[in-house]
Amino acid sequence: MRLLAPIPVDRRPRRFVQLLAGLLLYGATMGMMVRAVLGLDPWDVFHQGVTAWINHWIPLSYGAVITIVSVVVLLLWIPLRQRPGIGTIANAAIIGFTTDATLAVLPTFTNLPTRIALMTMAIVGNAVAGALYIGAGLGPGPRDGLMTGLVARGVGSIRVVRTTIELTVLAVGWILGGVVGVGTVLYALAIGPLLHLLLPRLMVKSAVPQTVRVNRVPEAVGAGPSGTAGEIRGAAVVAAGQGDPNPHPRPEFHDPVAVDPDQIWEDGEGR
């Protein structure tokens, strides 16, 4: 059994460059949001709270905590039978380091207009970064893989599972000392529409037809994202490029997940 999901065979140079650019920018925008001190997205409230709590005993940087949490979340993939892609591993390894590097060079700002401008740039940049690395098609982030794994096991719909996870980490992070503020609300309102706008434009389209095995399908047209039918044996050939009825390919989930990727884009970032 393969430990990693297969890497798409076409356009690999562009995929890897786009993945690296997206992850570096993602970490930089996370550092910008911290310096804006206007509130963070739910997972980063959790990271910040854990950092504040654990530093009572062990001196760990914010970026180191991000990396540790990513590894712990990846371990939760095992019972869910999810396979990470190379992009998933790169996500866990790069973002925390880049966030720390950004915090090391970016000063703390006290002027409110400057902080608002910084937060605005961070949210827009974060959406661009997310669209870049998700669009590379090399695997979802650890946290989104946890979500889709739970959905595939029938725990609930994407909206229910994602909302439950994010409210939980937000509450725990806030209790531990993470910053919740107007930036948290702005991020929640803006990130979905921005990703929905950017992702089709940054998705790496396949240059050759691909064979895609479908393991689970909705029970019927209009079935909810958690509804599944029996396994289908066989493959479906999806043509990309000219003549493709869907010119914007969706993100590839290499494990059988009965979810609608559109909902992932609309609900938030792909980390």
Model-inferred region functions:
Residues 1-243, 247-270:
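Core subunits and conserved enzymes of cellular information-processing
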